[in-house]
Amino acid sequence: MMRSRSKSPRRPSPTARGANCDVELLKTTTRDREELKCMLEKYERHLAEIQGNVKVLTSERDKTFLLYEQAQEEIARLRREMKSLARKAMDTESELGRQKAENNSLRLLYENTEKDLSDTQRHLAKKKYELQLTQEKIMCLDEKIDNFTRQNIAQREEISILGGTLNDLAKEKECLQACLDKKSENIASLGESLAMKEKTISGMKNIIAEMEQASRQSTEALIMCEQDISRMRRQLDETNDELAQIARERDILAHDNDNLQEQFAKAKQENQALSKKLNDTHNELNDIKQKVQDTNLEVNKLKNILKSEESENRQMMEQLRKANEDAENWENKARQSEADNNTLKLELITAEAEGNRLKEKVDSLSREVEQHLNAERSYKSQISTLHKSVVKMEEELQKVQFEKVSALADLSSTRELCIKLDSSKELLNRQLVAKDQEIEMMENELDSARSEIELLRSQMTNERISMQNLEALLVANRDKEYQSQIALQEKESEIQLLKEHLCLAENKMAIQSRDVAQFRNVVTQLEADLDITKRQLGTERFERERAVQELRRQNYSSNAYHVSSTMKPNTKCHSPERAHHRSPDRGLDRSLEENLCYRDF
């Protein structure tokens, strides 16, 4: 036992211990049985020898009895001779003393023989009693061996049942692992879809912010155009007044008027080119919007295009400023012409015609402004569609969250199953502990039996010392021992096979315990991932609410700016055309408020 334990690399299971104990018990019991049989044969032979000695002693006793009778006869004869032969008394007395000494020696021999006979009888009785005890012990050991074999069979059946239960648990574990893999894949796909949707939402928000910035810039450009138109009208009024004064100077300034007409024609061409560029920019903006609706991947291109358009708009503003500067230069020239040409009043008709032409240009510019406003409205409609798409994406996010909740419910069910498996495992462990205790009790009983057997062995060794003459019989019994060893080797091979099966079962149990530990680690990792995703969702919601509040503030500031900008021209002039141009700003404010309502929703 100690060698097998020292050689084993790891601690054997209680079932392996029980099997080893059973094997050793079988070996020891078979050896003890054979030794007891040999001892019985020795005792029988010893008894035969003792009986032979008793027979010899009885024959000697009979001889002594005969000699004693003969001595008595001789004594009687001598007495008769003493009576008859008084003379020969001295001779006979010496003979009588000698015979008395012989009688005493014979009596001592007789007493010694009687004592030896009593001792041998007592020793035989003791040996018979010891033989009966040994036979009873052998019977008890046989019964114990039978009980141990039955217990081994029952334990093997229980081990097979436990193996079946472990296989069922392994199958359930595989099913649960498959379910967990599916759930983890679903969670990963949901996380990826959430990330993609959040990216698309962020892209849409960026596009909306860029569109709003573009609309703001266009409104600012329209305001600047209106201011320029008002300035041009003022300049036209001033030119009409000046032309009334310069009616007398027509003849002298005819050539100057021709030059001015050429410059006006150039300005018209420049304005037409600017209007064409504006129409081209509007068409490009519409194309860009269609591209934005089609693909979200071309956002960077759109940004570059918007930057180029902003640069073109800035160039247009610079050109308008240059035109204003040219107009101022023309006014200076006109003043110089007023000082030089007071006699050109006759050419007022041509100047009025030119003023009418300028009014027509102003009307065309107002039409272009209306077109810009219509384009802004289309921008706003597209922004509303983008908001609707954002709302749809948020609904999809809610659906994904519901799917997450269902996945969490599935995870809770899997946890409950894991708890049930742990409880069943604990029950199995308790059963194994109870069996280990039973095996320990059996081992204690076996130890007590071994101690008794060792005592018997010590007694047998003490008796072997007295019976060394019976070693010749052991040679005949060696063949029987060889056959018994062969049978024991076969039994040991069977026991080794059983040990290997038990080792395989223990390895399976260890693998299953490792799998359960890995399963628990996976469950803890999934719980940590879920906590992280929950925290990320909370932070994203907080950032979303913060962005909504910032958008509200920005829209509130932009609305205040638009209101202040629309109030300024109202204080300056009260023409119906300006009131007509004021209505789109109100529509912009309303659309922005509606967009904010959509975002709040």
Swiss-Prot record:
Classification via InterPro entries: Centriole_BasalBody_StrucProt
Region Disordered, residue ranges: 1-20, 563-588
UniProt key word rRNA-binding: no
Name of the featured protein: Testis-specific gene 10 protein
Biased segments, Basic and acidic residues type: 574-588
Compositional bias per record (Polar residues), positions renumbered to this chain: 563-573
Region feature (Interaction with HIF1A): 459-592
Organism of origin: Macaca fascicularis (Crab-eating macaque)
